[in-house]
Amino acid sequence: MNYLFKNGRYMNEEGKIVATDLLVQDGKIAKVAENITADNAEVIDVNGKLIAPGLVDVHVHLREPGGEHKETIETGTLAAAKGGFTTICAMPNTRPVPDCREHMEDLQNRIKEKAHVNVLPYGAITVRQAGSEMTDFETLKELGAFAFTDDGVGVQDASMMLAAMKRAAKLNMAVVAHCEENTLINKGCVHEGKFSEKHGLNGIPSVCESVHIARDILLAEAADCHYHVCHVSTKGSVRVIRDAKRAGIKVTAEVTPHHLVLCEDDIPSADPNFKMNPPLRGKEDHAALIEGLLDGTIDMIATDHAPHTAEEKAQGIERAPFGITGFETAFPLLYTNLVKKGIITLEQLIQFLTEKPADTFGLEAGRLKEGRAADITIIDLEQEEEIDPTTFLSKGKNTPFAGWKCQGWPVMTIVGGKIAWQKESALV
């Protein structure tokens, strides 16, 4: 099916929002211009809505295989499509881990059979993510590994991390890191700060993250490896990454929507839906994340979509697993709380969720360019809705944002020229 989207707006090559039509033919973007006419194409009048590149998320947890009670490739990718994401990168903390030919081939077959959006799987750095034996990077790359990470845990052995970076560098691949120094975790379930003290909870200190990043940056410099930092959350981490970039070290970084919108002061009670890793930090950390995003220290926004069951989250804040769902709330949360409040521009938000992650990892995505795959998201910037977890397509309903009123909701997502998801009656 060919589509002609009429009367939309998009961000052009100069970063300006302008009027446009967009023609999709044979799964590709055929033309982006005003007043397009075309035969043999279904005309969809988007009536002034934003035509954006499909959103790109380099940090997601789909749980399959092994955690299908939390999420599946099918439910997770449908939730991603509803959130406007057309390309997502799946973390390897599944059971089994994609750490060898057999497991990666099985995962790729599942993706091919079930995914509603483009899914790029990470390969594990170490076998079973146990930290003691390196995987066969060459084989995992051959089978389509996006990059290498043990996300969910930090690689504790510096010699292992250095060896992994050297091998990844030879393959022109990135090493992606969840940064925690295990000796500093303190059995914590929240940030070590005012909230932990008030509620008598063990806290995770900020330095637990930043000291690990500092170590890895020096290792990346020694290995001449592209090193990407997951979900930055502390002022110290931002400072270390900024210094590394100024020194010319190949480091990039991401931040989550929840760390940009919330800090520990916003946690109303010992509610497990506010439990994520890294935890919500203090006000100074939150301000540093915004500053880091604006000055280029932090390159992109990634959701860290981490679904869990209601039963798992009902165990109380100390026993419940870390993580919140992110796909279906990301854009409206960021648009409402950052763009509408004048903290960043709409153009910047689009870049942080599209071209910046795509360019960082060399993906042919994130831009509406003629000849590229038609991965497109239509967004109604005027539409206001209340976040209602019961409407989530993800199996995970675990969100701290239930009841929040937000503007800027995706209404249609196109992947490879096919409609992957559409809001009922939004475009008629």
Curated annotation (Swiss-Prot):
One of its GO terms (molecular function) is allantoinase activity. Its cofactor is Zn(2+). Its EC number is 3.5.2.3. Substrate binds at residues 61-63, 93, 277, 308, 322-323. The active site is at residue 304. Zn(2+) 1 binds at residues 59, 61, 151, 304. Catalyzes the reversible cyclization of carbamoyl aspartate to dihydroorotate. Belongs to the metallo-dependent hydrolases superfamily. DHOase family. Class I DHOase subfamily. HAMAP family: PyrC_classI_B (MF_00220_B). This is Dihydroorotase. The gene is pyrC.
